[in-house]
Amino acid sequence: MNTTPDTPTPRALRELTPLEARILGVLVEKQHTVPDTYPLSLNALTAGCNQKTARAPVMNVSEDEVTTALDGLKHLSLVMEGSSSRVPRFEHNMNRVLGIPSQAIALLTILLLRGPQTAAELRLNSARLHGFADISSVEAFLDELAARAQPLVVRLPRAPGARENRWMHLMCGEVNMADFASADAGGGADSVPPSEFEALKAEQKRLADEVTRLNALVQRMASELGIDVDTPGNAS
């Protein structure tokens, strides 16, 4: 699945920090989803880094931290700062520096923002960046990214009970495959991935908070009406 990027000569890069990787992902994402505000101001870029949705892990970074990370990315030529506005604005230069086409950039961006994904998840989550015809085309680009002299992605061992392998980016360094293999070997067919487990815990807490709120509302209304009501929280 070879298409010609802006430049055919990729550069060897150092490992990125998690924040540097997040910044690159945000810049590519916002280039496609909010083109009217791209290149991004420091404030918009920081907000994108701290976004609660479509991010794993969720971050809470300051503008000073983002500025420091931007300096590192500018040194690598991965980010450029515009000079046509009084407010500094930043844009990515990933296509030229990495020497990969826009389709591959779209997949890499989702991995930078959301963590490990299956090919099917990547096709779904990258729809606003590029419309892949099918999963096989996604896998073809992933295979090319993994086969580079300096691989940008890796296929992870299949989790117990999973139907597909997940993929992970390597922009922040190599992955210890033994960690994934040992975790997989220790799990059973009903094992729940950590991300799904955390989501279930968050949902459980949300439901518990909602029950508490409703109980309080029932008690208040009963008190106003002079009615005695036993709620689960008050049952003996």
From Swiss-Prot:
InterPro entries: DUF480, WH-like_DNA-bd_sf, WH_DNA-bd_sf. Disulfide bonds: none annotated. Pfam families: DUF480. Belongs to the UPF0502 family. This is UPF0502 protein BceJ2315_62050.
